C-alpha cells in the first residue's frame, strides 16, 4: 500500500489505486513527512513581505514563494533548478510545493489528541479503563496517576490527589512507586497497556485475550456490555497494528502554508486563515514551556503551561469540543482543522462532492413553442462563449487563422465567418440543461442547441413537468459535454427524447399540460346544433376539406367511414386522428380528451409504436393544442362563476341541524367532543353538497337551436363555461378552487391545526366579510411558513435516502433467490385502492402462475409480468401472486436484474450497472418537495371527509362472516363483539369480491349467508366514540368507581348537566371496572369461557349506565371518545415518511402479542394491567408457554378475555412499532408494513411511486444483523454486522467444524444505516465526520471504493452504468469485410441522391 503523502507526487491516473486506508500516524511518520521544524510563531515580515525563517511560512521548510527563486534573490530562473541556496537555505524549485510540503512542531510534553480523548466513547479512556472525567483530571494537571506501583499496595492507573500523592511518598518512600501527571503519564500508561496482572510487555494482544476470558465469566448483562465495548476498541488496535501510544501527540504536523494563506490587504493589514492563529498559539505556548523547563521553574507554573499547551492543541484540532471556544479578534470562533472537514461548507460537501464546473452558463428561460422535443434554443452570445475552444480549433483547421491568439481576436470581433463556424460546431453537439433544485435525474437533460437571437434560453414546453419549470422568471444552467464519450452518453442516455417515462412510476412524464390540454380538449368536445351536424363523410380527407371550406364546425357531430366501418364522431376528433400513429385504434381518441386521456394516449403509443413515434406524436399534439387553444379564445369573466341557486336553502338546513345538535348537547345527551365532531361533519357535508350543486350547474347547460325538422328544440349538454372547461380538462384549477370561487369556502383550520367550527359560507365572488377574511389568513400564512420549512426538511430526507441507497447497484443477472413476496390488491375500507395488476406489472414471477380454472401456465417462473400477462392474470381471477423482490434478493453486493424487474424509465428489464438505489431515493424524495410546496394552493381550506360510519357493498353476491363474534340483543339486532371480524362478499362462483373489516361494537344489518344486491348497508357504528359492550345480561355493579377518586362528575359549563368520566387515580391498586351480576348478586360468567363478566375502564371513558341498572347483552356500558379530528395534510405526511424511514419508535406504541393464543387478564402490578396470552397446542391450552404483557393503566386495552389473538396483533390502541413487527413477524411482514405505510402518505396526495423504490430503501435498512450468540466466530456479542459478512464467517466456521454465530435481523433508520456503511469516506462525508474518522483511524479501516460517493470524492468514475469496472477492460474488435464497406458506400450514395 502506498503512503498517502507520496500522493503529493500526484498519481496521474486516479484509477492507479484500488483502496484507501486510514490509520494513526506515529511520531516518526510525522517527522518523516516533515521538511523541517517550525520553531517560531512569526509569519511574514510586515515590511518586506518575505516569510520569516523558521516561522510558519518559512521558505526553507516549505519551499520558495516565487517559482524558481530563492528567498534572498541569489538564484533566479530555471537554470538553477534543484540548488539549495547557501545563504538562505531555500531550495530553488516551483512554488507550488508550498501546497504539499508539511512541517512539524516538536512538543515539549506529549498531549492527547482530542478526537481520541473526547469523541464518545473516549478511546484512550476505554483502553486504560479510566473514566473520561478522571482522564481529564490527569491530562489537565489536576491529579497524579500511578504508572507503576512496583511493590506498593497502590494499583496501576489509580488516581492520587496532591495530598494523597505526598502522603504516599512519605509512606512508601520516593523510589517505591512511579506516578505522574499530564500527557507524559498517560503516554507511559498507553505504552505499557496490557493485562492487569502481568504488568508490561503483552500489549494489546494480551489485553484482548484477558477481556475475552472475562467476557466468558461475566454474569450480569451490564458488565458484559461494558467489556464488549472495551474489547471492541482493543480488537481494533490488535487488527490494525496501530500502537495505543500514538493517540498521544509528541509531534504535531503543520499543514502546507498555501492551504492556510496569509493575504496582504490594502492599508497594511492582512487577511489570514484561522489556522495560522491556532498554530501560533501552540508554538508560543510550546516555546514558553521549553524555556520554563530550562529555567527549572516552579512545578505549578510548568503545570499551568502544560495545561495551556494541551488546550491550544485541542483548539487546533477541534475548536470548541472542550472548554471555551477560542475566538478571534472579532468574537468569531476560529475554524479548526475539524471544522474544515465538517458540514455543508466543509471539504467533503463543498469541494469534493460538488464542484463548480467550467463550460457552463445560465440564463432565464422562455417557452419555445416551435422547438422539436430534442431541441432547446441557445442564445448566440452564450453559444459563442461556451464553444470557444471548438471554434478556435475549427478556425485553425479551416485556415482562417494560424495562432490561437489571432483566433481569439477574430472571435472577439464577431466576424461573419465565426458565426458560420459556430453553426457547424454546435450541429449535433448536445448540451445539458439543468434547473435547480435537481430533485431527480430528469432535472438534467440533454438537448441539441438551436441558435437564437436574444438572451433567454428557449425550453420545449413538454419537458417543463420533468424540470418542474415555469416561465415566471426561472433560470436554467447550460453545460457542455466536452469529450466524445460524454457527448455520446448525453445523446444516448440523457436526451430528452430518451426520457419519456418517469423513473418513479413508469408512466409518461412528457405529458401535455395547460394550454395544450385545453386546445385538444376543446377540439374533441361536441357541441349541440353545430354547423354540419349529422353529415356523413366517406373519409378523413373529405372531413378535412369540408372543415377547411367552413362547411362543418370543429365540434359538430358527424358520421365518417374509417377502416371500413361507419363511426359516429366529431370533426375535431377526426383531425386529431390524423396526427396519431395509425397503429392506434380510433377508439383511443374518439372521446373527450382531457389530460388523463392524453397521458394514456402517450403511454399507449409508447407501448405499441415505440419511442420515435411517441416523440413525433408529442410534438404534433403540442402544435395542434396551442393552435386550437388560440382559436378557442377561452377567457374568464366574473359571470362564469355561477353561484348555485340552492345554496341559501342548503345553508339554512345546515344551520338548523347545528342548532339541533346544540340542543342535544345542552340537554346532556352528547359530550362536547361529539358535539364538535358532529358539527364539523355537518358543515363538511354541506360544503360538499354546495360544491356538487355548483358543479352540476356550471357543468351543464341547455343548448337551443333548430332541430332536424326545422323546429326549435332544447338539448342538455356539458357546458362550455370557460372555468368549467379549464378544470374539467385538467388544464388549470380544480373543483376545489372553483368551489371557493363560486360555492362556499367551507371549513378553515386554526394555526394549531384544529378546525374552526363556523365555516366561511361566502365565496370569493360574493366576497368575504372581515371575520371571514381574518379566518382565511391563518391558512394562507401557515401555508407559506410551512412551505419554507418543509422544503428544507424534504431536501434533507432526500439526502439521507440517497446516502443510504447509493451503493444499491444492479450487479448481476440472477442471484438465484428461492424466495419472494406475495402481492395482492391493496384494499382499504373495503375499497380496492390499487389493483393487483398495477402492483405486479414489470415484476418477475417467482413460481409458475397457473390458471385456477384451466390447467394452463399463464406466466412461467422467472418471467417478467408485462401488460399482456397482467391482463391474463386478472381475467383468470387470481388474487395473489408470488413475485421476486429486491427485499429477498440474495446478491451479496448490490441487487440482481431478476429481483428488480423492469426499469420503469425504459419499459424493459433493468440493465446491469443501473444505480437503482439513487433512483429509488430520488423517486421518494422528489414528490416530498413537491408536496411541501403544494399546501398553500388551497389556502388552508380544511379538507376532511365525513367520518366513515357504515359499510356498503359494491358488488351483488352472498355475505359470509369471517371470524365475527356477535351478541344478539332482545330486539334481534346483532352487535359485533370482537375486533378482527371481516365481512366477505362472494360472487356466484364463490370467488371473493370484497372484504371489509368490521369495527368492535358495530351493528350488523345483514345475516351470514344472505344474498344481497349492490349498495346494501351491511353494518353501521358510531364514528365518534369507541364503545365498551357487555356480552351478558344482568345488573350493573360499579367496582372501585369512587366519586372524586377514580371518577369525576364533570359538570358541563354550558349545559349544567353532570356526566361521569373515569380519571387517573392516585391509588395504584384502584381498578375501575363494571361487573355484571345476576339476580343473586353473583358475577355472571362469559358465554364461552370461565372468565367473569368484568369490564375494566380506561381513563377518559364516559359511563353510560348507572349502578344497579339492568342491561341486555350487546348494550353499551361506557364510551371512549375518539380524538377530535385534525386535518390530514402532508404536513403530517413528510415527518411521517421521515419517521418511518428512520425506524423511530413511536411515543405511545402499541404492545403487540408475540404468539397466537387466547387472552386472559392477570393480577395488576405496579399500577399496570397484566395481559396473559396462552397458546393452544393441538387444541389444548399450554399455560407453561404463556406470554405476559404489562400495559399502563390509562391505556385502552383493545382485547377482551377469551379473544383469540394472532402473533403481531396489537393488544392496545397506539401506533405500531416497526422493531416489534420485525421481531415478531419477520422481515417480509415488516417490509410490507413499511411499504404500505409510506405509500399511504403519498397516496393521500395523489402521488404515484412504484413499490420497488420503497423496497430498495427498506432493503438497505435491513442489511445488518445483531449477534445474539457468538458461537466460535470472531464476532463480539451485540455487535452489528452486514448480513453477507455474517453468513461468510458462519460458513467458514461450519466448514472448520465449529459452532456458528446466531444473529437476529436488525432494522436501522436511514441515518444510522448510512453511517454504518462499509466505506468510511462515504460515512464521513454524510454526518458526524469526526466521529466516523476517529473510529476508522483506530481500526485502520480500508475503503475499497465500491459505492458511488467514495468514488466521486476520490475523483474517479462511479462504478455504475458506463463506469462499471468490467467495461473498463473491454476491447472492441471490429471486423469489416471489404464488401460491407462497398455496400455502405453505395447505400450512402443512394440516400444522398434521394434527399
UniProtKB/Swiss-Prot annotation:
The keyword Transferase applies. Binds 1 Mg(2+) ion per subunit. Mg(2+) binds at residues 470, 472, 474. CDD domains: RNAP_beta'_C, RNAP_beta'_N. InterPro entries: DNA-dir_RpoC_beta_prime, DNA-dir_RpoC_beta_prime_bact, RNA_pol_asu, RNA_pol_N, RNA_pol_Rpb1_1, RNA_pol_Rpb1_3, RNA_pol_Rpb1_3_sf, RNA_pol_Rpb1_4. Keywords: DNA-directed RNA polymerase, Magnesium, Metal-binding, Nucleotidyltransferase, Transcription, Transferase, Zinc. One of its GO terms (biological process) is DNA-templated transcription. GO terms for molecular function: DNA binding; DNA-directed RNA polymerase activity; magnesium ion binding; zinc ion binding. Zn(2+) 2 binds at residues 815, 889, 896, 899. Pfam families: RNA_pol_Rpb1_1, RNA_pol_Rpb1_2, RNA_pol_Rpb1_3, RNA_pol_Rpb1_4, RNA_pol_Rpb1_5. One of its GO terms (cellular component) is DNA-directed RNA polymerase complex. Its cofactor is Mg(2+); Zn(2+). It catalyses: RNA(n) + a ribonucleoside 5'-triphosphate = RNA(n+1) + diphosphate. Zn(2+) 1 binds at residues 70, 72, 85, 88. Its EC number is 2.7.7.6. HAMAP family: RNApol_bact_RpoC. Belongs to the RNA polymerase beta' chain family. PANTHER family: DNA-DIRECTED RNA POLYMERASE, DNA-DIRECTED RNA POLYMERASE SUBUNIT BETA. DNA-dependent RNA polymerase catalyzes the transcription of DNA into RNA using the four ribonucleoside triphosphates as substrates. The RNAP catalytic core consists of 2 alpha, 1 beta, 1 beta' and 1 omega subunit. When a sigma factor is associated with the core the holoenzyme is formed, which can initiate transcription. This is DNA-directed RNA polymerase subunit beta'. It comes from Anaeromyxobacter sp. (strain Fw109-5). The gene is rpoC.
Amino acid at each position: 500500500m502506498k503512503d498517502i503523502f507520496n500522493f503529493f507526487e500526484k498519481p496521474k491516473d486516479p484509477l492507479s489505486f484500488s483502496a484507501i486506508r486510514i490509520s494513526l500516524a506515529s511520531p516518526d511518520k510525522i517527522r518523516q513527512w516533515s521538511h523541517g521544524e517550525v520553531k517560531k510563531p512569526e509569519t511574514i515580515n510586515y515590511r518586506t513581505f518575505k516569510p520569516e525563517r523558521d516561522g510558519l511560512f518559512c521558505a526553507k521548510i516549505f519551499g520558495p514563494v516565487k517559482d524558481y527563486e530563492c528567498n534572498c534573490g541569489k538564484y533566479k530562473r530555471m537554470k538553477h533548478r534543484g540548488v539549495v541556496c547557501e545563504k538562505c537555505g531555500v531550495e530553488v524549485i516551483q512554488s507550488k510545493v508550498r501546497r504539499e510540503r508539511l512541517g512539524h512542531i516538536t512538543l515539549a510534553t506529549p498531549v492527547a489528541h482530542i478526537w481520541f480523548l473526547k469523541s464518545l466513547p473516549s478511546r484512550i479512556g476505554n483502553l486504560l479503563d479510566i473514566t473520561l472525567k478522571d482522564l481529564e483530571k490527569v491530562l489537565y494537571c489536576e491529579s497524579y496517576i500511578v504508572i507503576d506501583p512496583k511493590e506498593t499496595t497502590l494499583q496501576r492507573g489509580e488516581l492520587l490527589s496532591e495530598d494523597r500523592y505526598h502522603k504516599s511518598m512519605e509512606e512508601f518512600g520516593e523510589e517505591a512507586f512511579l506516578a505522574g501527571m499530564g500527557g507524559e503519564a498517560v503516554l507511559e500508561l498507553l505504552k505499557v497497556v496490557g493485562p492487569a496482572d502481568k504488568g508490561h510487555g503483552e500489549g494489546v494482544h494480551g489485553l484482548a485475550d484477558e477481556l475475552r476470558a472475562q467476557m466468558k465469566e461475566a454474569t450480569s448483562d451490564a458488565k458484559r456490555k461494558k467489556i464488549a465495548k472495551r474489547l471492541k476498541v482493543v480488537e481494533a488496535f490488535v487488527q490494525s497494528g496501530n500502537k495505543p501510544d500514538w493517540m498521544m501527540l509528541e509531534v504535531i504536523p503543520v499543514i502546507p502554508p498555501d492551504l492556510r494563506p496569509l493575504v496582504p490587504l490594502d492599508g497594511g493589514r492582512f487577511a489570514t486563515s484561522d489556522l495560522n492563529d491556532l498554530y501560533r498559539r501552540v508554538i508560543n505556548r510550546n516555546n514558553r514551556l521549553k524555556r520554563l523547563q530550562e529555567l527549572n521553574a516552579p512545578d505549578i507554573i510548568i503545570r499551568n503551561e502544560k495545561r495551556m499547551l494541551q488546550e491550544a492543541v485541542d483548539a487546533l484540532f477541534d475548536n470548541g469540543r472542550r472548554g471555551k471556544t477560542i475566538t478571534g479578534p472579532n468574537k468569531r470562533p476560529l475554524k479548526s482543522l475539524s471544522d474544515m472537514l465538517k458540514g455543508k461548507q466543509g471539504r467533503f460537501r463543498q469541494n469534493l462532492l460538488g464542484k463548480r464546473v467550467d463550460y457552463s452558463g445560465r440564463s432565464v428561460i422562455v417557452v419555445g413553442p416551435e422547438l422539436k422535443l430534442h431541441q432547446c434554443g441557445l442564445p448566440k452570445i452564450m453559444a459563442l462563449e461556451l464553444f470557444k475552444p471548438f471554434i478556435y480549433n475549427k478556425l485553425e483547421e479551416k485556415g482562417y487563422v494560424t495562432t490561437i491568439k489571432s483566433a481569439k481576436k477574430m472571435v472577439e470581433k464577431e466576424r461573419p465567418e465565426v458565426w458560420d463556424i459556430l453553426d457547424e460546431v454546435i450541429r449535433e453537439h448536445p448540451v445539458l440543461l439543468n434547473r435547480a433544485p435537481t430533485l431527480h435525474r430528469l432535472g438534467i437533460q440533454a438537448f441539441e442547441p438551436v441558435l437564437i437571437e436574444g438572451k433567454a434560453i428557449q425550453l420545449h414546453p413538454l419537458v417543463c413537468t420533468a424540470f418542474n419549470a415555469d416561465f415566471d422568471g426561472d433560470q436554467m444552467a447550460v453545460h457542455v459535454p466536452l469529450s466524445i464519450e460524454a457527448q455520446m452518453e448525453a445523446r444516448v442516455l440523457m436526451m430528452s427524447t430518451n426520457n419519456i417515462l418517469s423513473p418513479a412510476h413508469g408512466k409518461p412524464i412528457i405529458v401535455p399540460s395547460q394550454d395544450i390540454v385545453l386546445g385538444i380538449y376543446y377540439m374533441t368536445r361536441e357541441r349541440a346544433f353545430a354547423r354540419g351536424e349529422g353529415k356523413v363523410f366517406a373519409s378523413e380527407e373529405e372531413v378535412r376539406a369540408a372543415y377547411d371550406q367552413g362547411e362543418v364546425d370543429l365540434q359538430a357531430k358527424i358520421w365518417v367511414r374509417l377502416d371500413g366501418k361507419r363511426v359516429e364522431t366529431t370533426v375535431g376528433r377526426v383531425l386529431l386522428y390524423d396526427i396519431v400513429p395509425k397503429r392506434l385504434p380510433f377508439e383511443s381518441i374518439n372521446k373527450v380528451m382531457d389530460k388523463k386521456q392524453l397521458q394514456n394516449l402517450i403511454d399507449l403509443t409508447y407501448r405499441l409504436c415505440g419511442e420515435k413515434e411517441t416523440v413525433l406524436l408529442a410534438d404534433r399534439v403540442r402544435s395542434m393544442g396551442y393552435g386550437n387553444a388560440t382559436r378557442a379564445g377561452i377567457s374568464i369573466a366574473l359571470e362564469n362563476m355561477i353561484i348555485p341557486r340552492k345554496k341559501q336553502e342548503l345553508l339554512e338546513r345546515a344551520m338548523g341541524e347545528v342548532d339541533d345538535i346544540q340542543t342535544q348537547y345542552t340537554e346532556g345527551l352528547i359530550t362536547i367532543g361529539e358535539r364538535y365532531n358532529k358539527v364539523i361533519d355537518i358543515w363538511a357535508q354541506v360544503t360538499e353538497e354546495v360544491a356538487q350543486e355548483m358543479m352540476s350547474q356550471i357543468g351543464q347547460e341547455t343548448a337551443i337551436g333548430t332541430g332536424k325538422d326545422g323546429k326549435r328544440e332544447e338539448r342538455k349538454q356539458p357546458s362550455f363555461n370557460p372555468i368549467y372547461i379549464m378544470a374539467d380538462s385538467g388544464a388549470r384549477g380544480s373543483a376545489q378552487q372553483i368551489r371557493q370561487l363560486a360555492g362556499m369556502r367551507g371549513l378553515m383550520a386554526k394555526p394549531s391545526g384544529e378546525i374552526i367550527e363556523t365555516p366561511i359560507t361566502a365565496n370569493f365572488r360574493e366576497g368575504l366579510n372581515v371575520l371571514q377574511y381574518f379566518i382565511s389568513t391563518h391558512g394562507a400564512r401557515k401555508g407559506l411558513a410551512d412551505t419554507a420549512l418543509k422544503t428544507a426538511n424534504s431536501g434533507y430526507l432526500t439526502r439521507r435516502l440517497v446516502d443510504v441507497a447509493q451503493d444499491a447497484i444492479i450487479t448481476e443477472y440472477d442471484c438465484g433467490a428461492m424466495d419472494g413476496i406475495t402481492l395482492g390488491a391493496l384494499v382499504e375500507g373495503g375499497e380496492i385502492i390499487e389493483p393487483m395488476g398495477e402492483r405486479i406489472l414489470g415484476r418477475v414471477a417467482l413460481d409458475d402462475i397457473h390458471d385456477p380454472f384451466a390447467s394452463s401456465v399463464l406466466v412461467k417462473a422467472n418471467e417478467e409480468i408485462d401488460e399482456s400477462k397482467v391482463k391474463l392474470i386478472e381475467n383468470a381471477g387470481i388474487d395473489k401472486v408470488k413475485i421476486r423482490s429486491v427485499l429477498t434478493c440474495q446478491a451479496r453486493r448490490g441487487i440482481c436484474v431478476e429481483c428488480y424487474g423492469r426499469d420503469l424509465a425504459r419499459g424493459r428489464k433493468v440493465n446491469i450497472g443501473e444505480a437503482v438505489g439513487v433512483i429509488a431515493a430520488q423517486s421518494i424524495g422528489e414528490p416530498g418537495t413537491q408536496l411541501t410546496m403544494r399546501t398553500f394552493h388551497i389556502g388552508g381550506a380544511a379538507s376532511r371527509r365525513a367520518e366513515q360510519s357504515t359499510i356498503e357493498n359494491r358488488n351483488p353476491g352472498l355475505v359470509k362472516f369471517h371470524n365475527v363474534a356477535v351478541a344478539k340483543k332482545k330486539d334481534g339486532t346483532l352487535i359485533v363483539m370482537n375486533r378482527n371480524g371481516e365481512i366477505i362478499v362472494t360472487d356466484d362462483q364463490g370467488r371473493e369480491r370484497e372484504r371489509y373489516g368490521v369495527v368492535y361494537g358495530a351493528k350488523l344489518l345483514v345475516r351470514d349467508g344472505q344474498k344481497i344486491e349492490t349498495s346494501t348497508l351491511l353494518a353501521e357504528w358510531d364514528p365518534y366514540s369507541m364503545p365498551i359492550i357487555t356480552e351478558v345480561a344482568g345488573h350493573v355493579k360499579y367496582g372501585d368507581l369512587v366519586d372524586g377518586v377514580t371518577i369525576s362528575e364533570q359538570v358541563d359549563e354550558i349545559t349544567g348537566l353532570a356526566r361521569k368520566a373515569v380519571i387517573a387515580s392516585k391509588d395504584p391498586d384502584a381498578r375501575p371496572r363494571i361487573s355484571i351480576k345476576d339476580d343473586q348478586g353473583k358475577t355472571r360468567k362469559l358465554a364461552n369461557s370461565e372468565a367473569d363478566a368484568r369490564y375494566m375502564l380506561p381513563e377518559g371513558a364516559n359511563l353510560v349506565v348507572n349502578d344497579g341498572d339492568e342491561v341486555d347483552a350487546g348494550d353499551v356500558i361506557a364510551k371512549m371518545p375518539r380524538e377530535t379530528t385534525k386535518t390530514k395534510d402532508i404536513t403530517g405526511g413528510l415527518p411521517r415518511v421521515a419517521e418511518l424511514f428512520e425506524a423511530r419508535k413511536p411515543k405511545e406504541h402499541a404492545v403487540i402479542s408475540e404468539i397466537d393464543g387466547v387472552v386472559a387478564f392477570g393480577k395488576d402490578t405496579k399500577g399496570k394491567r397484566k395481559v396473559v396470552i396462552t397458546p393452544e397446542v393441538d387444541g389444548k391450552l399450554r399455560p407453561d408457554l404463556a406470554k405476559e404483557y404489562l400495559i399502563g393503566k390509562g391505556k385502552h386495552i383493545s382485547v377482551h378475555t377469551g379473544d383469540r389473538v394472532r402473533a403481531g396483533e396489537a393488544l392496545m390502541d397506539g401506533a405500531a412499532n416497526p422493531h416489534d413487527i420485525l421481531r415478531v413477524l419477520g422481515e417480509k411482514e415488516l417490509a410490507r408494513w413499511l411499504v404500505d405505510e409510506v405509500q399511504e402518505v403519498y397516496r393521500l396526495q395523489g402521488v404515484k411511486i412504484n413499490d420497488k423504490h420503497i423496497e430498495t430503501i427498506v432493503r438497505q435498512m435491513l442489511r445488518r444483523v445483531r449477534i445474539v450468540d457468538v458461537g466460535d466466530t470472531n464476532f463480539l456479542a451485540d455487535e452489528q454486522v452486514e448480513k453477507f459478512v455474517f453468513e461468510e464467517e458462519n460458513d467458514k466456521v461450519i466448514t472448520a467444524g465449529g459452532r456458528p454465530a446466531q444473529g437476529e435481523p436488525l432494522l436501522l433508520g436511514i441515518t444510522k444505516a448510512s453511517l454504518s456503511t462499509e466505506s468510511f469516506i462515504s460515512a464521513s462525508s454524510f454526518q458526524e465526520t469526526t466521529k466516523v474518522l476517529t473510529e476508522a483511524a483506530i481500526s485502520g479501516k480500508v475503503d475499497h471504493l465500491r459505492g458511488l460517493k467514495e468514488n466521486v470524492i476520490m475523483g474517479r468514475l462511479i462504478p455504475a452504468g458506463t463506469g462499471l469496472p468490467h467495461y473498463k477492460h473491454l476491447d472492441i474488435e471490429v471486423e469489416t469485410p471489404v464488401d460491407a464497406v462497398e455496400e455502405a458506400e453505395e447505400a450512402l450514395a443512394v440516400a444522398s441522391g434521394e434527399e
